């Protein structure tokens, strides 16, 4: 009898064997019913379903509620809707959770997950803090801000500066409004008229204007209108016409100085680094997109509002400095730039970028300058 040789089983590649085993396991479980099948596939559920619930952030802005209705609320509402329940950002206005002066510390400690502010106002411990907010004559138009960040190295400088700070991530900087001085009873028609005026103002521009006797005063944002009414403040040097009308300060102030020492406020978004790390990539991208949307909203709101209210606004009388006084302010700003540039090599890089940008815009001519 001839022996019949049994075929020798082929050895499976370990990887292929693993795949087949997985398939057998799946088919076995599938036969147990729909409920068991659903239970066996939860490992492939979307990212958010693996969490205990939606990611929740607390974001505080430098602005009060009337202004916040334009400079950030539309963005946060849009983000929360688009996040589809995966993430919710709770929005707080100036001083609601922490005092504005404590914004940075609260962000760094994780009390806040994100902040919208400028460096100078929230006292960021970086050597470029002076450039946040209003830096005298750094800009003429709102588009100058994103152009400086994209083409003149400011983005890299900001990233470098915040890389040195634990637990804080800089996300983006955009433009706000130009800076004007609004007063209650004392019109400014010369530099001498600034002497002794107590104004609610931003740090860097306030420091520069104190050269002419202006006295910057810091109080909670919500107290400004009452302080103007009681005489605690003589005016504000904190914003442009659009904000002055929107938040009610134009109802209290009677005079507006049309000269502007800078064309746009530098405002930024920051995140607590551990909080940012917990956000999945698609929600990070969504948040950054919503920031860009907010930058665009503000650019249009301010650009249209400033011109319209200067021409059609009837709540304040416009005043202007004499040409000789204004020329002195412009000339004094050059020394102020050099003073700030000398504070650190990084600050020097920012001022060098401002000078290069200003030179380029002047050479380009109309409509740039």
Predicted regions and their residues:
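N-terminal secretory signal peptides
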Residues: 1-25
